[in-house]
Regions:
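Juxtamembrane intracellular "pre-TM" segments in multi-pass secondary transporters
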Residues: 2-8, 190-220
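Helix-breaking motifs and short loop linkers at transmembrane-helix boundaries and internal kinks
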Residues: 44, 76, 97-103, 131, ...
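Conserved MFS/SLC helix-loop-helix module at the cytosolic interface between two early adjacent transmembrane helices
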Residues: 63-101
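Helix-to-loop junctions at the C-terminal end of transmembrane segments
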Residues: 65-76, 267-279, 363-364
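Paired small-residue
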Residues: 87, 91, 102-110, 305-313
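Cytoplasmic helix-loop-helix junction between adjacent transmembrane helices
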Residues: 107-148
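C-terminal membrane-cytosol helix-exit motif in multi-pass small-molecule transporters
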Residues: 175-195, 385-390
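C-terminal transmembrane helical hairpin of 12-TM major facilitator-type secondary transporters
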Residues: 281-325
Length: 401
């Protein structure tokens, strides 16, 4: 076997383990959506207040990107993913054992801090290991793990919410999954190259500034923060919305919204053909249209059964849009890819924290119409704006010598 073939085989095995890590991280990102009504009941809180378990995780996840990204560039991305996985074991176990709501929120902060190093540094590792022309398709493999986890987390959250095991059982299940993947990742580290020598390193703040100075990076980062606010924020309250509007059980509401991830998986399977046929500008444009139309359809749907097919279309549109953003995040500053992808994730999850905060207050005090109408208007506008910016960026890049 040639050295190149051996390296490709090693990379394929590592990508498989990273996809497993992304699965459990994706589950952690969405499992509390379906648990919110159960948490509200168990701790005598409103759904909006119970949403602090999502806000705290998202804020910690976003803020820790500013540390994990530079650490990945310094000490090796796969090594930092492995450390993060062991941190997730501790964080999820602590959440399962939390004695009260405030302790649970605090432990979700710790869990979010650890989880911050898993998916973004996995993306950055792929950016280093896979040429750009094959990167969309390879990122789609990681996306399959993430989306499978999101779907499983949404479903499991609803099932646990309706069972005697409750939220503690949900978190203990994730602890066990993290433990398996952490051990597999530890075994993969034997084939990883050594981190760069000290002379090749630059200060953390300089790494962040170097990425921020790139005009295109600022466009990508602003766009993904908008996605966090208007897509992920309201999405957290959709199971509670279906439960309240149609009287569905939490497991049934969660199962319908879990089809969001199935739509994303459909994109991941078809990604190479979609990229060739549509191109990136039309992908983000149509992604924005599908997301916005989906939120409007959720608002207007006369029966609960329509929520599932709508979720599937929204999921497909999301990843037309998001995977294009994600691919550009790996190219914002190739020499500092870990920092670039970490800043991308920081903006996404700070946007999500803002969005969940606004959505929770809206849901508690104003109801479902503004909760769903805001994304229905904002997401198509964001897709149109980024599509225009992307075309201008391509034109400038093609005009350079």
């Amino acid at each position: 076997m040639s050295a190149t073939a051996a390296a490709q085989r090693r990379h394929s095995a590592t990508i498989l383990v990273l996809a497993g890590a992304a699965f459990f991280s994706g589950a952690a990102l969405r499992i509390c959506d379906s648990l919110l009504p159960r948490l509200a009941q168990d701790f005598s809180r409103t759904p909006g207040t119970a949403g602090r378990v999502i806000i705290s995780f998202a804020l910690a996840y976003g803020l820790m990107q500013l540390l994990f990204g530079p650490l990945g560039d310094r000490y090796g991305k796969a090594r930092m993913v492995c450390i993060a996985l062991f941190g997730c074991i501790a964080g999820s176990l602590a959440c399962a054992l939390a004695p009260n709501f405030d302790a649970l929120v605090g432990m979700r902060v710790a869990w979010g801090m650890a989880a911050a190093g898993v998916i973004p540094l996995s993306l950055a590792w792929i950016g280093d290991a896979v040429p750009y022309e094959r990167r969309q398709a390879t990122l789609a493999q990681l996306l399959t793990g993430t989306l499978g986890g999101m779907m499983a987390g949404q479903l499991a959250g609803g099932l646990f919410a309706d069972s005697a095991l409750g939220w503690r059982g949900a978190f203990l299940t994730l602890t066990a999954g993290y433990a398996v993947i952490a051990v597999l990742m530890l075994l993969r580290l034997r084939g990883e190259p050594a981190p760069p020598p000290p002379g090749a390193r630059i200060a953390f703040a300089s790494q962040l500034r170097a990425v921020w100075r790139e005009p295109w990076a600022r466009v990508v980062l602003a766009t993904v923060m908008t996605e966090g606010v208007f897509l992920l924020g309201p999405l957290a309250y959709l199971p509670a919305y279906l439960h309240q509007r149609y009287g569905l059980s939490l497991s049934a509401a969660s199962a319908l919204i879990a089809l969001y991830a199935v739509g994303g998986l459909a994109y991941a399977i078809a990604a190479p053909r979609i990229v060739r046929r549509l191109g990136e500008s039309r992908m983000v444009l149509w992604g924005g249209v599908l997301m916005g139309a989906g939120y409007l359809a959720w608002l207007l749907a006369p029966v609960a059964a329509l929520a599932g097919p709508i979720a599937l279309l929204v999921g497909f549109g999301t990843y037309l849009y998001h995977n294009t953003l994600q691919t550009h995040a790996t190219q914002m500053a190739p020499a500092l890819r870990g920092t670039s992808v970490a800043m991308f994730a920081f903006c996404l999850f700070v946007g999500q924290a803002i969005g969940v905060t606004l959505a929770g207050a809206t849901f508690d005090h104003l109801g479902s119409i503004p909760l769903l109408l805001g994304p229905a208007l904002a997401l198509p506008a964001s897709g149109w704006g980024f599509a225009r910016a992307l075309r201008r960026h391509r034109t400038r890049a093609d005009g350079q010598p």
